[in-house]
Amino acid sequence: MPGNRKAELKLGGAFAPGERASHHGGFTLVELLVVIALVAILAAMLLPALSNSQAAAKRTQCLSNLRQMGIAANVYVGDNANVYPIAYYSDGENNIDYAWDLTTIEGNPNRVIPGLLWQGQGNVQIQQCPSFTGRANWLTDPYTGYNYNLSYIGHGQYESIPEPAKSSDVHQPPKTALFGDGQCSGGADKFMRAPFPNPGDAGFWGRNGGTQGFRHQNRSNAAFCDGHTESRQGRYTNNCENSTVAPGTGFLSPDNSAYDLE
């Protein structure tokens, strides 16, 4: 009926029978505080997981870098009468410093090219550990973070044993470290040293470098003479010179077993 129809119409902002008012207001202060607290809790839960994920990705990239360096070393050995690259030597007459990783031609400015390991060519950027944020001990080095087994493999011009080892000298290649995460009190020394002297290395004493950096979630990465890589957790700090070990650094074994040729 017309009268009933009019009664059902909205009048002065009222609602027809059966209609419900909807709430169009904003959040209350209490509701906003609850939401903010929940977001903060979720962030606190997710950030460590994200940080761990990023650290794991850097560790994986570092292992890949070391694996490529190991491959390059074995290629060098195959091309050079089974002899490993020497760790370093200097050509004073021509002002050239040769090292396993980079060759520096002195000048103004100095020119840096791929080193002996790369036989003068290659992508040397893989020599930069993605987790290393310090500096090189050698100020001319554009890349840093890795070191090479000087005590038993590479030796060098001014070492007691100047000639590098042959691959046939390494009796257990899976046990002998070739390259690794270098770090010491002064930065990143590019030369890896065993914790104790090589029996034939009379010049060992007095060196305060060559330790490994345990910067991958308390692990240190290394490549071995057979080409495989490892991420090692054991950090050994007892050696003949306490000054060799800085916070976050150490050796891969308590003795020379991770470095020697046996």
Task: Write out the residue ranges for each language-model feature.
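N-terminal leader/signal peptides at the extreme start of proteins
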Residues: 1-27
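Short amphipathic alpha-helical "recognition" segments used for binding
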Residues: 10-14, 23, 35, 58, ...
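Intrinsically disordered, low-complexity regions enriched for glutamine and histidine
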Residues: 21-22, 44, 214, 226
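Amphipathic alpha-helical segments typified by the pilin-like N-terminal helix
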Residues: 24-64
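Short, well-structured segments within or immediately adjacent to enzyme catalytic domains
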Residues: 60-262
